[in-house]
Design a protein with these regions (language model features):
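Active-site entrance/lid segments in N-terminal catalytic domains of soluble metabolic enzymes
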Residues: 1-209
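Glycine-rich adenosine-cofactor-binding loop
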Residues: 209-216
């Protein structure tokens, strides 16, 4: 992370909290920001209303900059046959645990609605995982005063983020815990470790002036 990026983000320490969707809290994000790093809210599973509530909670606890992260994903719309087949496959597991099968009423949050909420909330940083924005979306965030950070697992993905206007790229290597954010090409092509991926991305993005952040 470069000193120019630190100045742009308004933080004293080169530390960005992992968004950790599902296990983060506004209190944690506020504490990290108050300590000189950049606190983050993982909003991939938050509704627009929940995003607004979480952002307000952070702002009540600190006046320091913080960021919000979204999953770039299409909202699934499986047909009835697919849902029924899945329920039948899961039925024995529910029975083994003595539970009644619960038919899903929602598959994930609607990204378009989340994105609109993000623009309206105007956090210092808007970051993204599992996909990529288009240039118009990045421009809307810039107009709202947000620094845009994209996640990349390959140099190809890092260059794609630079092409649409991202300010920084978070280079996430093979060691990423739990899941990968690969969105271009096959997962098997994204087997580079973070310590190797970071300098590769730095070299590739230097001509565009795009900063590189090493993922944890």
């Amino acid at each position: 992370m470069t000193s120019s990026l630190l100045q742009r983000l308004g933080i004293a320490l080169p530390i960005i909290q992992g968004p950790m969707t599902g296990s983060d809290t506004p209190a944690l994000a506020a504490a990290v920001s108050a300590a000189g790093g950049l606190g983050m809210l993982g909003c991939g599973m938050r509704s627009p209303a929940a995003m607004a509530e979480a952002a307000a909670a952070v702002r009540q606890q600190t006046d320091r900059p913080f960021g919000m992260n979204l999953f770039v994903q299409a909202t699934p719309n499986p047909d009835e046959a697919t849902v029924q087949a899945a329920m039948e496959r899961l039925a024995p597991l529910y029975a083994e645990l003595g539970l009644q099968p619960q038919r899903p009423t929602q598959w994930c949050e609607d990204f378009a609605a989340q994105f609109e909420a993000l623009v309206a909330l105007r956090p210092a940083v808007a970051s993204f995982t599992f996909g990529i924005l288009d240039a118009a979306q990045v421009q809307r965030l810039h107009s709202a005063g947000c620094t845009v950070i994209g996640t990349a697992t390959t140099v190809q993905e890092a260059l794609a983020w630079a092409e649409v206007g991202a300010d920084a790229v978070c280079a996430s290597g093979l060691e990423a815990g739990g899941h990968r954010g690969t969105f271009l090409g096959d997962f098997t092509a994204a087997q580079v470790g973070t310590l190797a991926l970071v300098p590769q991305c730095v070299d590739a993005l230097a001509p565009q002036g795009v900063a590189v952040i090493a993922a944890g």
